[in-house]
Amino acid sequence: MSCKTKLPIWTAVVATAIALNFGGVATPALAEEVVLHMAVPDWPPTRIMKDLFNKNYKAPSGNHVKLDIDFIPWPDYYTRLNTSLTSGEKKYNMAVSDSQWLGAFIEAGYYRKINDLIDADPGLKATLSDMHPNPLQAYATYPYKSENYYGFPQMPDILINYYRTDIVCNEDEQKNFRAKYNQKLPCTPEEMDDVDWDTFEKMGEFFMRQKGDMLAGKPAGDDFYGIAYQAGRAYNNSTRQINGFIWQHGGNIWDEAQAPTGHAEGVVNSPEAVKALDHYLRLTKYMPPIVKTGGMDALKTDELFREGKLAMNIEYIGLAENTINPETSKVAHKVAFAQMPGLRGADGKLVRWSNIGGQPFVIMTWSDDKQIKEIVDFVKWWLSTGTQHAFAAAGGQSAIKSVYNDPKYLDYRPWNRTWAPGLEWQKDAWHIPEFFELLAQGQEQYDLAITGKQDAKTTLDNIAAFQERLLKEAGHIQE
């Protein structure tokens, strides 16, 4: 994982920010050693965080604070965190949590409510008020969009379009695309920003090549595929992309904000939702054959793109750092980034609703007062202007408006131009304790549709019936 680039430049900036934010570092007569144990998924954003902490953090209390992190592979992360929490071992003071886990782990007594910490700290309150509401609501609130806060954003994330400039901007490909579709093949990031799903589908069809076919002026060394997005059975790897299609088509998933009167049946399987799922499924014909096996998750599409087997990939920003690193990517110098495609409305504008990625920090309920004080100071440092800029300079993202609206933010990474407009289109799925049952059954049903075993209507009828029954039993839907 590459954590290179501009970190040394920002050391002084971070130090200055700490002094400004906290009024300097106290030096008590007897400094204590405080260890904060944290569980995190192992990927670039958390590695960058640890690197910044090791190089720059000094506790305002004057204590010697150590951040002891367990880096856990993403595929195992939920299982291992859940096992630790339910075992009663109380190993972690903090964790980076997926937003969907909030309800289950809050109701089980593991995640601490933080309203009192926010109310007691004007600086922290001001920082959160400077945060875009979409990620703040997604990462912090339970119930979703309530005033009950449980998390601080660690790495906000959204889906964007990764594409191969050497392929789509090639003169021969440009000429042949115009001849076939009577329209220009988008090339520049600005042109790609205006790509709707219809053009995306055409590009997917156009760039399907077999080994030996001409591709950008030379024979393809391997089979080459037009497009990819998440369509895997594991965890939430089809649900998130499908949610975006449903919202763009004017449909909805079951909305916990409408409880207890909002139903699943008639909403989850509405005509708009069925049309959206059909749309999602139609595009899979221009994807690598692994899509028909249930194995095309976010990590697999990322791998395929970095191996040079895709023209375009709809992927979370959190994986982009490896794409521009020549040590991990064959296309590091042949890639550009644009906003995710959308559905073009009658007014000609693109509707880009999408399921937000990213994760918050959470505090465990058993953390003592001394640990909580150090955690809050750590979080304030993390969300401070200097640290957020340093994180962005190293490949991360910030949900703080005054940070990402700073003109220099655009210079840190080529995908940052997509960030501010993309945040406007983010929604989240369920935060309720029953999320896992909802997710597992939905993933199973979507996999049947993706692999060609049942149609879109049957799939959504099955999901709607299951959700209606489960949510009634749980008291989230009342007659």
Give the predicted meaning of each segment.
Residues Y139-P143, H333-G342, A392-L448, E473, ...:
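Long, aromatic- and glycine/proline-rich binding clefts that accommodate carbohydrate-like moieties
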Residues E32, S61-N63, T86, P143-E147, ...:
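Extracytoplasmic/periplasmic substrate-recognition and gating elements
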Residues S99-I160, D198, G217-A220, S238, ...:
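Hinge/lid segment of periplasmic solute-binding proteins
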Residues V34, L52-N134, A138, E171, ...:
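Extracytoplasmic "Venus flytrap"/periplasmic binding protein-like
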Residues T83, K90-N93, G123-V168, D347-S354, ...:
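A structural signal for short loop-to-beta-strand junctions that line the ligand-binding cleft
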Residues D42-K66, I106, Y162, D166, ...:
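Short, polar/charged alpha-helical segment
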Residues T199-M208, Y235, T239-G295:
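Glycine-centered hinge/linker elements that transmit conformational signals in sensory
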Residues D116-M131, K175-M192, Y229-G232, N236, ...:
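Short, solvent-exposed loop/beta-turn-alpha elements that line the ligand-binding surface or hinge
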